[in-house]
């Protein structure tokens, strides 16, 4: 490009460089989208806009992509490197109005006909200044936002710092030419498909128009289900119909979000400023699969694990910066206090009570509101655990909202609903001290403004944050596979509860928890905490800690827990340096070197971070424990031992493998442990390697407390086969608390009620106990003896003496 156009662009770029601060989606387009910069690249934009073109240019230059203003030379032919699908008023003939775009597509395709080695990558790019969906006023949402010059000027002026450049995966023009030909009709089809692509992309980024709140309430009141619930309310409480209707409206006011794009923008600015000061980085993985689902028209339901109140803000912030619509979020009614409640409501929160029992009107209003969100196409987010995990492990899922999601599908008319499991990880959780107190029996403090201010005042260096998107679960596909005749239950009026609903919801919930754990993120803090807590003195020399971290890292890299899990690329030494900056550990120096210590008062809190990745290391830890105890053991016997204990571990930690997959996993882990020199393999037997016995012992310690807990329950069951489930849970906790005191076990979840409740349910499912409570003493004693070999003799004596003392 030369002459007047170049001067014009330079002049136009002066104000744009000041007013526009755009963000690229994805953050690093070339590697994330697989663009090959050694091959020709041309850009396709939805409509003629110089501001968009220059904003794209700035991002291309920042990411080492070809300059869109520099023409492509192919076989002596000069062609513009960009194409506008929709035309507009032109200043120079250099611009390409709509009919020109078809000609340009044809020219590019024609060059592929004459040059068999040519393969131009066509990259669709949309530039968005602001993402306000607007309010419903009857007009149809335009497929592309065409702004004239004056409108564009004000959009840039007001929204220049809220602009996004969205790069889409490239389309190979070579493949297009080979499969569809190169004539003009193919060029026209290409332009038409591009227009549809941009319309879908805009909907995925901006979302459907927002309803006026009163219009939404009126529509809900007119629904058959709520009208019937209002009549029932009036009859059962002996109040007038008007009063019952007012009660319904009051519930809608309590529940419904009041989404505000301006509040999203303001919060984005504040959070952007805050994150940069609190977090050293927010790591996002597998977002492209979610963008693709949104682009394909799926109704997205985000199902993250729940670690902290920070989850609400972090996930919405991440989604917004990934070019997706911030979802409507189901938040606990405990967060509806001033000023947080009104702010969260404008950020998309809708509030949910802890229980629906005994309030038919409330449950009907909530279910209809959720169904309305789905039918309008809004993305939704809820925490399937029901509350924040106090231990760092996933909680057993609460299935109420998930059940309502499937009931919404049974009303018919919704787009395909896809559940997106999300793992959220932190190197520092601000509530972790409060969690430890609550697990020790302290009363949960009610959320309030003073409590919020105290929490904010404690915010310091939070390290790294992690948001990993797990494997999506399309509900329609799942139901087609597991409940082939589910469509027979569709009822557009009534909320139906077919017989298959509860077991199916339970299975989906369990599957979601597994998928969340599959997307686990190892980081400096949880790895260092795992190693230091494995040491009985909670201290290791720097060399020992480095060796232990290398063991964990190699296991996770060479035998990955799943394809969705992430492991740091940094070295063990770099991870230790980073963890030390978090000020959780003490360092003592002597003439030999550094000793890294986890102070006693911190040890209880640090179990939280260890538990975040317990599922990723528990199988190699169990293998290490078995090999350490037996000194040498055949693969077959090792496999038998793992097979006996695996169902309990799978249920407790939501592990991903089925029993029939275990032999291959055990073999892969054994080979990796041999490669690391932790064990030797001789004649199909695993032997300890004395040179690395400490590393193996520390690895084995990762399963120590879990095995002790199982030993308690199996001993109680063997000693009293007729014990009922409730008493078994209670007595197991009592012995665990005693063990914790006598043997200095610092993990609060060691005697957590939920952990023992889950274990006893698994024992029932595995046939160790029946619903009537009777156990098979021979079987339970066999398992106890297996466990007794894996725990120390002093712990075993404490367990056995506890029950003898009671007798």
Swiss-Prot record:
Biological process, per Gene Ontology: CDP-diacylglycerol biosynthetic process; fatty acid metabolic process; phospholipid biosynthetic process
Impact after mutating residue 349 to T: In plsB26; results in high KM for glycerol-3-phosphate and reduced specific activity
EC number: 2.3.1.15
Membrane topology: Peripheral membrane protein
InterPro entries for the chain: GPAT/DHAPAT, GPAT/DHAPAT_C, GPAT/DHAPAT_LPLAT, GPAT_PlsB, Plipid/glycerol_acylTrfase
Protein name, entry field: Glycerol-3-phosphate acyltransferase
Organism per entry: Escherichia coli (strain K12)
Function summary: Catalyzes the transfer of an acyl group from acyl-ACP to glycerol-3-phosphate (G3P) to form lysophosphatidic acid (LPA). This enzyme can utilize either acyl-CoA or acyl-ACP as the fatty acyl donor.
Key words, A-Z: Acyltransferase, Cell inner membrane, Cell membrane, Lipid biosynthesis, Lipid metabolism, Membrane, Phospholipid biosynthesis, Phospholipid metabolism, Transferase
Domain notes for this protein: The HXXXXD motif is essential for acyltransferase activity and may constitute the binding site for the phosphate moiety of the glycerol-3-phosphate.
Membership in a protein family: Belongs to the GPAT/DAPAT family.
Catalytically driven reaction(s): sn-glycerol 3-phosphate + an acyl-CoA = a 1-acyl-sn-glycero-3-phosphate + CoA; sn-glycerol 3-phosphate + hexadecanoyl-CoA = 1-hexadecanoyl-sn-glycero-3-phosphate + CoA
Record annotation: effect of changing residue 352 to A: Reduced acyltransferase activity
Pathway(s) where this gene product acts: Phospholipid metabolism; CDP-diacylglycerol biosynthesis; CDP-diacylglycerol from sn-glycerol 3-phosphate: step 1/3
GO cellular component, one term: plasma membrane
Major place of residence: membrane
